[in-house]
């Protein structure tokens, strides 16, 4: 295949070499539109047809238009001898987005990416290629700027993100249009592109023309901001500037360091931790900023931020980021551990067994969570004083052992350590703990 314009081929080759990518099989996200058509044909040539076109039908538009687009995609791939997979969305995105309280764009994107990941595995491919171009990059930076994004957002769309590649990020929309026109290549036009239904369309159709009138050549300036932002982000990514204590299901920060460190770096660290734990959380700057209003000398412990996936709490001289892996674990538990019988704590996969008792007076051992701590003290003040010894332990993971309503031991389920015991009694009892707070 020979093109009348090889400028895009040159840029794709430069992209591959710059990012040290191999030329193994690629899944190309193909919609039939101008951008993905240009990407598909150029990668077919560059990778010697070691590609699979993947089309995802959202069925957000009318069935008639969607089916016409599918017909075009199939005919196009037949014409150019390109392997094609077509996947139809198995949920109603419009109604489901309302039920979940997310935008149609967001849910459609999630469904499409999930389908692409499955196609990657099915076809034993190395990369998923998306057709974002230079203009998409500009639009993204502007949207993120007005949405109050951090430097990470102003870095723009990454050219390579794990197994996702975007070879056209240095190619302008004008170059794409010229390529298709010169080579007389047909493409499908999505009717929603000209409508202001979605945020990106409104930015593209209404905002950018106004900016262009006032700031000629603004694209170069935004590109420079993006490059500088990326340099900062890469620099902070390399080094850990913030001391963090890591547990199985939590991260802990020193309170004073947390409050005195630049907010940007603290916010970045929190989002980085959430991302590493597979939590995609939308937390507003306003909500996070509230966490910095906590008083250092205030003795009261309190929750600073709470979501469905995690919560941020102040506890003594620490700020703890704790994940809600299983709601069952955070509900109080209170049970009897009988001699010779196993008992399982569901979340942590902890198995407990009272193996033997050297006294007839001990036959059943009571196990309960930290919430029951006041049951063992008549005086609430004495209880607080006693448990203040264990401020280094996260109370969520403390299991209390009691006999005849008397506290005889405390186990930290996070470390499986006996942190305190009434030795005169506990030495008569043998307890086995198997497992640990293992990630699912």
From Swiss-Prot:
Species annotation: Borrelia garinii subsp. bavariensis (strain ATCC BAA-2496 / DSM 23469 / PBi)
InterPro entries: Rossmann-like_a/b/a_fold (IPR014729), TilS/TtcA_N (IPR011063), tRNA_Ile_lys_synt (IPR012094), tRNA_Ile_lys_synt_N (IPR012795)
GO molecular function: ATP binding; tRNA(Ile)-lysidine synthase activity
Domain notes: The N-terminal region contains the highly conserved SGGXDS motif, predicted to be a P-loop motif involved in ATP binding.
Main location: cytoplasm
Coiled coil (UniProt feature): none
Keywords: ATP-binding, Cytoplasm, Ligase, Nucleotide-binding, tRNA processing
Single Gene Ontology BP annotation: tRNA modification
Protein name, UniProt field: tRNA(Ile)-lysidine synthase
UniProt cross-references to NCBIfam families, sorted A to Z: lysidine_TilS_N (TIGR02432)
Protein encoded by which gene: tilS
Function: Ligates lysine onto the cytidine present at position 34 of the AUA codon-specific tRNA(Ile) that contains the anticodon CAU, in an ATP-dependent manner. Cytidine is converted to lysidine, thus changing the amino acid specificity of the tRNA from methionine to isoleucine.
EC number(s) stated in the UniProt entry for this protein: 6.3.4.19
Sequence positions that bind ATP: 31-36
Gene Ontology, cellular component aspect: cytoplasm
Catalysed reactions, as listed in the record: cytidine(34) in tRNA(Ile2) + L-lysine + ATP = lysidine(34) in tRNA(Ile2) + AMP + diphosphate + H(+)
One Pfam family in the UniProt entry: ATP_bind_3
Family: Belongs to the tRNA(Ile)-lysidine synthase family.
Membrane spanning residue stretches: none
Enzyme class: ligase
Compartments reported by the entry: Cytoplasm
